[in-house]
Amino acid sequence: MDPDSFSIDVAGRGQTTALVYRAKDPMGATFLLAHGAGAGQTHPFMVDISRRLAAAGVDVITFNFLYTERGKKMPDRVDDLEACWRAAIASVRARGGPTPARLFCGGKSMGGRIVSQVAASNAFPGAGLVFLGYPLHPAGKPKVRRDEHLPAIDVPMLFVQGARDSLGTAEELSKVASKLPRAAVVPIEGADHSFAVLKRSGGLTQEEATQRVVAAVASFIRAGLSTKRTK
């Protein structure tokens, strides 16, 4: 089934499109997912992950950042990216969407980094954050870190990270997460920043790697819902 769509008004900046992948057997949670710097919400990875999570019981909503919606390759300024994330959250909630206890947000690479900055600077109206390939540092520049703001986030965080990610390996992320009170890292053996695995590595197949990504996210969201219900 094709996803539904709706428009998001990013006040004073323009409009963008969101896609809704409805869960077949809903667990009662919504995952708002942003794309990375190099590809929009219709990239095969985004579509595949969204469909698989919907099959696992999670309602998934993706959206384009404004530069992607306009057909541009260069990402917007950080304040515009953050404004788009805030508008997406507000739009989902205004449409009669989930309460904060049932809303999870995250993104692939840059999309995740931007929502982490939003969550660190404001009271975050959600139950948790999911990062698919968090860009801890630029490729080849491990000392240029992007983790200074993470301790300010007060909701549970899940980092799903490839063991070969050139923007921060799972091992590097584990060291960061060990200093955060509510963070967990799920390493994907043999995977790079795009969660692609080497065909002749003798480790996980591509399908197995993708399944582990989806299972990690679904389990994190399910656990987050259970925690809220027991309080």
What role is predicted for each listed range?
Residues 152-154, 159-161, 165:
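Short beta-strand/loop motif that positions the catalytic acidic residue
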Residues 85-155:
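Primarily recognizes the serine-hydrolase "nucleophile elbow" in alpha/beta-hydrolase
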Residues 11-15, 137-144, 167:
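Short gly/ser/thr-rich secondary-structure transition/capping motifs
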Residues 179-199:
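Catalytic histidine neighborhood in serine/cysteine hydrolases
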Residues 32-36, 133, 161:
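The conserved beta1-alpha1 loop
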Residues 199-231:
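Catalytic active-site module of serine/aspartate enzymes centered on a nucleophile-bearing elbow/loop
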Residues 5-102, 192-202:
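Serine-hydrolase catalytic machinery in alpha/beta-hydrolase-like enzymes
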Residues 166-172:
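Conserved alpha/beta-hydrolase "acid-adjacent" motif
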